């Protein structure tokens, strides 16, 4: 459970932070862009017992086309929902500053190498809907 949290937590953080960068951008091109791309952003890496460390990394961001159409047979809908997600990543480990005695100072996070629009995979992305 802890291993999954260490991996999925940073992945979700990268996706959310990347999404925030897109929403905050003032460029008209970013507002109309449809697709999935690698984009640089900065986040604060932290864990209990250590000071935070600002990290600049690459993450996936974008907007992918989705659609649904009614059909006559169950389940009565044909859905095509794709998300901007990681296709290829590498893991980077950094040492957090000023950790308390007994606290592991190392923090590992994914760096996006390639991103694509695709089906949501719980191995790399938090796939819950609202």
Swiss-Prot record:
Disulfides per UniProt: 36-84, 50-99, 60-115, 64-117, 120-127
UniProt GO cellular component terms: cytoplasm; extracellular region; extracellular space
GO biological process terms on file: adenylate cyclase-activating G protein-coupled receptor signaling pathway; G protein-coupled receptor signaling pathway; regulation of thyroid hormone receptor signaling pathway
Glycan attachment positions: 87
Cellular location(s): Secreted
Tissue note: Highly expressed in brain and at low levels in pituitary. Also found in retina, testis and skin but not in pancreas, parotid, kidney, stomach, liver, colon, small intestine, thyroid, brain or adrenal gland. In pituitary, colocalizes with ACTH, suggesting that it is located in corticotrophs.
Post-translational modification: N-glycosylated.
Signal peptide per UniProt: 1-24
Recorded superkingdom: Eukaryota
Chief site of localization: secreted
Keyword terms, alphabetized: Disulfide bond, Glycoprotein, Hormone, Secreted, Signal
CDD domains found in the cross-reference section: GHB_like (cd00069)
Alphabetized GO MF terms: hormone activity; protein heterodimerization activity; thyrotropin-releasing hormone receptor binding
SUPFAM superfamilies recorded: Cystine-knot cytokines (SSF57501)
Assembly and oligomerization: Heterodimer with GPHA2; this heterodimer interacts with thyroid-stimulating hormone receptor (TSHR), and hence stimulates cAMP production.
Annotated function: Functions as a heterodimeric glycoprotein hormone with GPHA2 able to bind and activate the thyroid-stimulating hormone receptor (TSHR), leading to increased cAMP production. Plays a central role in controlling thyroid cell metabolism.
Family to which this protein belongs: Belongs to the glycoprotein hormones subunit beta family.
Protein name according to UniProt: Glycoprotein hormone beta-5
Species this protein is from: Homo sapiens
